[in-house]
From Swiss-Prot:
Residues that, per the record, bind thiamine diphosphate: E51
GO cellular component annotations of the record: acetolactate synthase complex
Cofactor note: Binds 1 Mg(2+) ion per subunit. Binds 1 thiamine pyrophosphate per subunit.
Entry protein name: Acetolactate synthase isozyme 3 large subunit
CDD domains reported for this sequence: TPP_AHAS, TPP_PYR_POX_like
Source species: Salmonella typhimurium (strain LT2 / SGSC1412 / ATCC 700720)
Upper lineage: Bacteria, Pseudomonadati, Pseudomonadota, Gammaproteobacteria, Enterobacterales
Length: 574
């Protein structure tokens, strides 16, 4: 049996798990691991400029590929800097394994240099935290960590590694476990056949059905059976922010995103539905508005692998616990055996009503404006990339414009912080995607506020030659804050105007990249085309676009209202 130190066990375990990339930042508590990375080899390590960005990069990789992202940080401030990234992944159910250094076991609890209780601090925002106390436990703990992160409802797992168990002078027998199990953890994957049959019968008899798709559908990769059911029953489809791409956005039956800034037709369809078929969703507050007024006539069918998400906010009349792909495949088997009849006249009437809502063209904007509209920037990007880019975003108006005006026809192409709403996510996430998928076009849609949260990662991009397009919608404001202040706080712009902005073009050039400025609508097509060509030639391009600072994101639901209560413009409401 091979004899390895604890640090070597960490690296060998990652290799045996199939890990190709690790994102991290060294420090005293993990120097033995970094030395093992150098001597053992086999893993590409990306040296970030801030630990939060390391987690976002691993997160971007995980969202784009479905693989578990891996992070390595030191103890104390290295670990605490990672917390925002961990919480971001936790809220969106993204599989990560975070390896954090810790002071020696004999010093834990004595306020040693760079000591912090990483297990305790991370506990609210992880699936599980491990503190490894014995060198020989490292392979099994890491095997469990990867299994926990990827199985059931995915999420981040922290493995805290005290410095003394990594000692290079202390060699122990190494064996990578073939299988792993945990007595207290056994997620349900197949659905209850009786519940599935009830759900299928209810869906087939619905007069005003709607399918509501969330991020869980993407995690489960249930696209094929989902589409089969949707097309078989001619069902309208709405999506949460996290679910975009699970069903093709340009498909006739897609009504787009629902919720706070969802389309008029999506929100109206939800409000008036008699059956909601929810797949991998949380019914979070951004998609329900006032729960007391939520979809008053709907029977709710809810498929989710996490039983705690079912009936958490919205009562499920027919709950089905299980992996969405397996449950939908079970549903198709039942459908093949005994297809229930469907009221075709009712469905035709329902679609006529939906088309009347769609005819309002809720996403129209002033395309002839002398100033650049952010909507036009995103539409131009979509056209030039043929809708085939991997798009990351930060948080704010630009995020909503990207979600509404870049139709995603494929899953895992839309990568954003949906649950936590983390500014500074977009750039490092884009670099993580590019690291994993070097041949793909990767675009970070950001704003003048968000980009400055982690702009230092432009240095990481240069070091590792990660050519992405950074598209900065620069409105000189914290745009979404300003929009709320305009609409709710009588236009009092308290601390939302971004004074003393840098020259982003020259800043990008200082980091060694290409910088481009767009100030007029007639420049959009040519300069974005130029930017994309630079990216194809292996250069990161930072495009600073001066957009109309007065533009709002519409539709916007009215606070405290139902799904059907929205502002459609500054002067028009439902």
């Amino acid at each position: 049996m091979e004899m390895l130190s604890g640090a070597e066990m960490v690296v060998r375990s990652l290799i045996d798990q199939g890990v190709k990339q690790v994102f991290g930042y060294p420090g005293g508590a993990v120097l033995d691991i970094y030395d093992a990375l150098h001597t053992v080899g086999g893993i590409d390590h990306v040296l970030v400029r801030h630990e939060q960005a390391a987690v976002h990069m691993a997160d971007g990789l995980a969202r784009a590929t479905g693989d578990v992202g891996v992070v390595l940080v030191t103890s104390g401030p290295g670990a605490t800097n990672a917390i925002t990234g961990i919480a971001t992944a936790y809220m969106d159910s993204i599989p990560l394994v975070i390896l954090s250094g810790q002071v020696a076991t004999s010093l834990i609890g004595y306020d040693a240099f760079q000591e912090c209780d990483m297990v305790g601090i991370s506990r609210p925002v992880v699936k599980h935290s491990f503190l490894v106390k014995q060198t020989e436990d490292i392979p099994l703990v890491l095997k469990k960590a990867f299994w926990l992160a990827a199985s059931g409802r995915p999420g981040p797992v922290v493995v805290d590694l005290p410095k003394d168990i990594l000692n290079p002078a202390k060699k122990m027998p190494y064996a990578w476990p073939e299988t792993v199990s945990m007595r207290s953890y056994n997620p349900t994957t197949s659905g209850h056949k009786g519940q599935i049959k009830r759900a299928l019968q209810t869906l087939a008899s619905a007069k005003k059905p709607v399918v509501y798709v969330g991020g869980g559908a993407i995690s489960a990769a249930c696209y094929a059976p989902l589409r089969h059911i949707i097309e078989t029953f001619n069902l309208p489809v709405v999506s949460s922010l996290m679910g975009l791409g699970a069903f093709p956005a340009t498909h006739r039956q897609s009504l787009g995103m629902l919720g706070m800034h969802g389309t008029y037709e999506a929100n109206m369809t939800m409000h008036n539905a008699d059956v909601i078929f929810a797949v991998g969703v949380r019914f979070d507050d951004r998609t329900t508005n006032n729960l007391a007024k939520y979809c008053p006539n709907a029977t709710v069918l809810h498929i989710d692998i996490d039983p705690t998400s079912i009936s958490k906010t919205v009562n499920a009349d027919i709950p089905v616990v299980g992996d969405a792909r397996l449950v939908l495949e079970q549903m198709l088997e039942l459908l093949a055996q005994d297809a229930p009849s469907q009221p075709q006249d009712d469905i035709r009437d329902w679609w006529q009503q939906i088309e009347s809502w769609r005819a309002r063209q809720c996403l129209k904007y002033d395309a002839e404006s002398e100033s650049i509209k952010p909507q036009a920037v995103i539409e131009t990007l979509w056209r030039l990339t043929k809708g085939d880019a991997y798009v990351t975003s930060d948080v704010g108006q630009h995020q909503m414009f990207a979600a509404l005006y870049y139709p995603f026809d494929k899953p895992r192409r839309w990568i954003n912080s949906g649950g936590l709403g983390t500014m500074g996510f977009g750039l490092p996430a884009a670099l993580g995607v590019k690291m994993a998928l070097p041949k793909e076009m990767v675009v970070c849609v950001t704003g003048d506020g968000s980009i400055q949260m982690n702009i230092q990662e432009l240095s990481t991009a240069l070091q590792y030659e990660l050519p992405v397009l950074v598209l900065n919608l620069n409105n000189r404001y914290l745009g979404m804050v300003k929009q709320w202040q305009d609409m709710i706080y009588s236009g009092r712009h308290s601390q939302s105007y971004m004074q003393s902005l840098p020259d982003f073009v020259r800043l990008a050039e200082a980091y060694g990249h290409v910088g481009l400025q767009i100030n007029r609508p007639d420049e959009l097509e040519s300069k974005l085309s130029e930017a994309l060509e630079h990216v194809r030639n292996n250069r990161l391009v930072f495009v600073d676009v001066t957009v109309d600072g007065s533009e709002h994101v519409y539709p916007m639901q009215i606070r405290g209202g139902g799904m059907d209560e929205m502002w459609l413009s500054k002067t028009e409401r439902t």
